[in-house]
Amino acid sequence: VVTMAGGQGTRLGHTGPKGTFKLDVYGKGKYLFEILIENLKEANKKYDTVIPWYIMTSKENNKETTDFLEKNNYFGYDRDHVTIFMQSELPLVDTEGKLLISKELKIKEASDGNGGTYSSLRASGCLADMKEKGIKWVFIGGVDNCLVKMVDPVLMGVAIDKQVTVACKSVVKANPKEKVGVFCKRNGKPNVIEYTEITDEMAESTDENGELLYGESHILCNLFSVGAIERMGANPL
């Protein structure tokens, strides 16, 4: 399991890393990391194993995330099966495509986002570690989805049955204006278009049955074969 946890909790009204945000769960405060760990521990018990967990942080929040998990003793998860790695960074540009320069006359950089996960897994040695452990399938999701089912044999079974190397879960959009990325085809290939990029006309388009043409939302629940991660990590996205 790979959890993308490089972001800050700004949009949640939280000053720290997203994973350190606390929710009210049945009257009890629980951190996002804590909830995910509980789900992993349940899967470990069900399948009589200990699932290797890879947490992707960023240069911005790596220390704070690591300190938080250490302080809380990884909420009881076996530390030997947790690997923390940092995602890469890319140069920042303005709206005209010009590089942004800091006061120290250095090129400003920021984390390269979800698309950099694959190359970061490769560069950090995590991909090699997965192969050494004999791992065949990897679930990749975001730290802020507390309802995610990180270990889903049905999703894996569908991928194997359909002979595909990538499988994604989707939820139908509540309405055309819902702020979620949606699945589409670009040049005949599966793709995701973000809500910030889709036009109103596209968002509101329907088929002959009145269903949204772009109604399958991308909820960041993705399953990859190790081979697929290796291929994508070797090619710039």
Task: Write out the residue ranges for each language-model feature.
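Domain-scale recognition of functional cores that engage charged ligands
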Residues: 1-3, 10-237
